């Protein structure tokens, strides 16, 4: 059975596969981030959102995986076999867990549409030959700026690429003024 854990969120395993494995923080850092930002919602008996539920399930899955790893470490006599199991878990399962945690934390932090836009932007950037692409990859934390603009101007067509840093800087004072007017309403 081929199950894509991102499908119901509008993404795919392939879309996340464009991000290199060293892009994702460690599981420990991601768990600390999830706890710091969303502990109350994650521990709540009430349903918050599908991303909270997926995050809970991923955290529980990681806990079970660590229980299994501990059992293997304590019960597998052959050091070579034990190392093979540990390396497989760290390389394959660890990466999948890091991807899931990153995706759902990012969706809760920046919004699903922004994360999907980032994944598409990064996928286009990474597949463009180096001679024809900007030197720096898109940055997720800069995309909410364009998302805010898009939400205010619903009649406009959505942006298809991340603006250049020079363009972003020149627009930010104007954006700040319009945001302050909105907050006064």
Swiss-Prot record:
Residue ranges, annotated region (Disordered): 136-185
SUPFAM superfamilies from the UniProt entry: Hepatitis B viral capsid (hbcag)
Record Gene3D superfamilies: Viral capsid, core domain supefamily, Hepatitis B virus
Modified residues (Phosphoserine): 157, 164, 172
Coiled-coil residue windows: none
Transmembrane stretches, start-end: none
Function: Self assembles to form an icosahedral capsid. Most capsids appear to be large particles with an icosahedral symmetry of T=4 and consist of 240 copies of capsid protein, though a fraction forms smaller T=3 particles consisting of 180 capsid proteins. Entering capsids are transported along microtubules to the nucleus. Phosphorylation of the capsid is thought to induce exposure of nuclear localization signal in the C-terminal portion of the capsid protein that allows binding to the nuclear pore complex via the importin (karyopherin-) alpha and beta.
Name under which the protein is recorded: Capsid protein
Taxonomic placement: Viruses, Riboviria, Pararnavirae, Artverviricota, Revtraviricetes
């Amino acid at each position: 059975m081929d199950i894509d854990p991102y499908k119901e969120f509008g993404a795919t395993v392939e879309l996340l596969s464009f991000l290199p494995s060293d892009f994702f923080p460690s599981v420990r850092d991601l768990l600390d981030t999830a706890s710091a930002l969303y502990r109350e919602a994650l521990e709540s008996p009430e349903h918050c959102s599908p991303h909270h539920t997926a995050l809970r399930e991923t955290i529980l899955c990681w806990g079970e995986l660590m229980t299994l790893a501990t059992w293997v470490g304590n019960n597998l006599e052959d050091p070579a076999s034990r190392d093979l199991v540990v390396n497989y878990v760290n390389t394959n399962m660890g990466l999948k867990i890091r991807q899931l945690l990153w995706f759902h934390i990012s969706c809760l932090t920046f919004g699903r549409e922004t994360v999907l836009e980032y994944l598409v932007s990064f996928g286009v950037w990474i597949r463009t030959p180096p001679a024809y692409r900007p030197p720096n990859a898109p940055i997720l934390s800069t995309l909410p700026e364009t998302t805010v603009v898009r939400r205010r101007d619903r009649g406009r067509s959505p942006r298809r690429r991340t603006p250049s840093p020079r363009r972003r800087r020149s627009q930010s004072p104007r954006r700040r003024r319009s945001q302050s007017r909105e907050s006064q309403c």
